[in-house]
């Protein structure tokens, strides 16, 4: 991470404008279509309210901040005894070890607070950077769902990675 100081922190309801700017600045090529495009301030306000109401109940939701600036988002959302991790970073902060560090910090919190057995990551096949982040954090390749995702006219395999409570 060189000299950058990265931290995960709770979201603040007043950050709708910053969140809107972030969501409209990230590379969406490999992001889920759950994120509206374009992302509006109303979308941000609704999401921040959901996070405020549900943090530590249905998931762990954190802002990724670097040197005091909002640069990304990371969450682990519960689904029964499993949960799915998702993250995004502003393009200017990619390939600096920040994603790896954010995943490293959030997983122990999620296992403890949400009483999880495992955390799953679903990755579009060409997203090598995300695969590297997961492998560096102990996630193991579990399988492939062929032709599972259509995004911007492209068809991608969906790769599944898992981190269990025992193997972390």
Locations of the language-model features?
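A short, aromatic/hydrophobic, helix- or strand-capping loop or linear motif
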Residues: 31-37, 58-65
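A generic local structural motif
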Residues: 48-50, 147-148
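A short helix-loop-beta-strand connector motif used in the catalytic cores of GNAT acetyltransferases and
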Residues: 49-63, 72
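Acyl-donor (CoA/ACP) binding surface of acyl/acetyltransferases
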Residues: 1-29, 63-168
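Conserved GNAT-fold acetyl-CoA-binding loop/helix
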Residues: 28-49
